[in-house]
C-alpha cells in the first residue's frame, strides 16, 4: 500500500469508529498505535531490534559521559545525531543548537545515527550531553521481559473489529508494551537523576511513552518543530489526541504552522509559539562566500538536490535523466545519509556527503526535492524549488502551501524540466517569509516561562 493510501485508510477509520475510547491504564493508545499501523501497511519503519541496531546501541553507550545526567539541569533536550550540520569545524544542531551557543543549563540526550553513532566531543559544542542509547537499551529490554504479561486494553473488542474490518494484521499488544516500556524507562531515568524543569523534544511522536512519564511527574514538554508540520504529515492530522502523550507547547517555524495548529488542530497542544529555526540564521551569517565560485566559470547554473531516505533511488534516477541532456548545468546531489546504491552516469552530477545543505541552498540557483522541508528553507535563501512530484507526494504535501509566484514548480517527468526551469530561473519572485526571525530570543523567551 502506498503512503497516501495508508493515510486515507487511517482517516477513514477515525471517522467511522470511536478510536479514542481504546485505552490502556486510562490513556488513549490510538494516537500511538495509528503511527505503527500505518507503517505496518507501508513497510516504512523498521521496528525490529536487529543485530546491527543492538550493536550500535551498545557501542554508543559511552560515546559521551553518562554521568553528566547526574547533574541538575533546567532543561533536557531530546534530539538526534542526524540533525547536526557542519558549521566550520563544529557539527551544530540545526534545531536545538541555540542551547549550547547560549550556554543554557541543558542536558542534551541524543539518539545515535544509524550506521554511525555520534560525533566526537571535539566536533560538537555541547558540554553536557549523553547518548539516548541508555534509554533505548533499557526500554527494549523492558519490552522483551514484559512479553509474558498481556496488557489489559479497554474497548479491545473495538480495536479487534477495526483490524478485522480493514483486513489488517497488526500485533497491537506488542506496541502497547513498547509504549509502557518507554514510559517505565523514562520513569527510571527520572528516579535516578535530578528532574529537569522542562523537556524539549524535536520528534515527540516517536517517544510518546517518554511524554507519559514526564506528565506523570508534572514536567512540561515543549516540542521543537524539526520538519514538515501540516495536515499532510501523518503525526499532525489525527482526529483526536491524548494530552498525556502530546506536548504542552509547540515551537513552530513560522506563521503557517502557527495557523494550522491554532485554527485547525488546537487539540494537538495547548500553546503554540513561533520561534523560527536556529540553523538558518547561523548558516546565513557564517556562509558568506559563494561555494560555487569556480564552478560558475564552467556551468551556466547550479542545481542542488536534497535527497530523502525513502526516495533516494527514484529521485537520483530522475536527476540523472535530466542531467544527461543539460551539460551546461551542474547538478549537486546531497543525500540525507551515506549510501552506496546511488549511482549517476552523467558527468555533470556530483554526489556529495556530509556537507551543510544550507550552505549549498544559499548559493544554488535552483533546488530540487520531492517533499523535503529544504523546500521551505530554500525560501529563506530566496532559492526557487522544482518539486519532483513522485507518486503525487509533492503536490499532496505542498501544492496548497506554495503559490507559483513563490518560485516553485511541480513536475512528474524529466521532459517537463525545461518548462519549469525557464519559468522560475532568473525571474523576480515573491518568496514566502516562512521562518520567524530572531530565533534565539524567541526560544529563550519560551524557555524562561518554564524555568523561572
Regions from the PLM with identified roles:
Residues 1-452:
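Catalytic-core helical/loop segments in enzymes performing group transfer/polymerization on anionic/lipid-linked
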Amino acid at each position: 500500500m502506498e503512503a497516501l493510501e495508508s493515510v486515507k485508510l487511517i482517516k477513514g477509520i477515525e471517522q467511522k469508529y470511536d478510536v479514542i475510547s481504546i485505552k490502556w491504564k486510562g490513556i488513549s493508545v490510538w494516537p500511538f498505535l495509528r503511527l505503527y499501523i500505518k507503517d505496518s501497511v507501508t513497510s516504512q519503519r523498521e521496528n525490529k531490534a536487529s543485530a546491527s541496531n543492538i550493536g550500535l546501541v551498545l557501542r554508543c553507550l559511552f560515546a559521551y559521559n553518562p554521568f553528566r545526567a547526574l547533574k541538575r539541569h533546567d532543561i533536557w533536550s531530546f534530539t538526534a545525531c542526524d540533525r547536526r550540520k557542519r558549521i566550520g569545524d563544529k557539527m551544530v544542531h540545526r534545531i536545538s543548537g541555540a542551547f549550547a551557543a547560549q550556554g543554557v543549563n541543558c542536558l542534551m540526550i541524543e539518539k545515535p545515527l544509524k550506521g554511525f553513532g555520534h560525533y566526537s566531543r571535539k566536533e560538537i559544542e555541547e558540554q553536557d550531553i549523553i547518548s539516548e542509547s541508555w534509554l533505548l537499551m533499557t526500554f527494549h529490554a523492558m519490552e522483551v521481559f514484559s512479553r509474558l504479561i498481556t496488557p489489559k486494553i479497554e474497548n479491545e473488542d473495538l480495536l479487534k473489529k477495526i483490524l478485522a474490518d480493514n483486513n489488517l494484521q497488526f500485533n497491537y499488544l506488542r506496541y502497547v508494551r513498547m509504549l509502557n516500556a518507554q514510559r517505565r524507562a523514562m520513569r527510571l531515568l527520572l528516579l535516578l537523576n535530578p528532574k529537569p524543569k522542562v523537556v524539549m523534544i524535536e520528534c515527540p511522536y516517536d517517544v510518546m511513552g517518554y511524554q507519559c512519564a514526564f506528565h506523570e511527574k508534572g514536567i512540561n514538554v515543549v516540542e521543537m518543530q524539526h520538519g514538515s508540520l501540516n495536515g499532510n504529515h501523518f503525526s499532525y492530522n489525527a482526529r483526536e489526541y491524548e494530552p498525556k502523550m502530546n506536548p504542552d507547547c509547540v515551537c513552530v517555524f513560522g506563521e503557517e504552522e502557527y495557523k494550522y495548529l491554532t485554527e485547525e488542530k488546537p487539540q494537538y497542544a495547548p500553546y503554540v509559539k513561533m520561534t523560527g529555526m536556529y540553523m538558518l540564521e547561523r548558516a546565513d551569517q557564517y556562509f558568506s562566500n559563494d561555494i560555487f565560485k569556480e564552478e560558475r566559470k564552467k556551468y551556466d547554473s547550479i542545481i542542488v538536490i536534497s535527497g530523502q531516505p525513502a526516495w533516494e533511488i527514484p529521485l537520483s534516477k530522475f536527476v540523472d535523466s535530466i542531467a544527461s541532456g543539460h551539460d551546461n548545468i551542474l547538478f549537486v546531489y546531497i543525500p540525507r545519509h551515506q549510501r552506496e546504491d546511488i549511482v549517476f552516469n552523467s558527468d555533470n552530477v556530483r554526489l556529495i556527503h556530509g556537507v551543510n545543505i544550507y550552505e549549498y541552498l544559499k548559493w544554488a540557483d535552483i533546488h530540487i526535492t520531492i517533499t523535503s522541508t529544504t523546500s521551505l528553507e530554500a525560501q529563506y535563501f530566496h532559492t526557487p524549488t522544482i518539486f519532483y512530484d513522485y507518486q503525487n507526494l509533492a503536490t499532496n504535501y505542498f501544492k496548497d502551501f506554495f503559490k507559483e509566484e513563490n518560485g516553485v514548480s511541480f513536475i512528474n517527468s524529466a521532459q517537463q524540466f525545461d518548462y519549469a526551469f525557464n519559468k522560475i530561473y532568473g525571474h523576480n519572485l515573491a518568496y514566502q517569509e516562512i521562518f520567524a526571525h530572531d530565533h534565539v530570543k524567541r526560544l529563550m523567551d519560551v524557555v524562561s516561562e518554564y524555568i523561572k
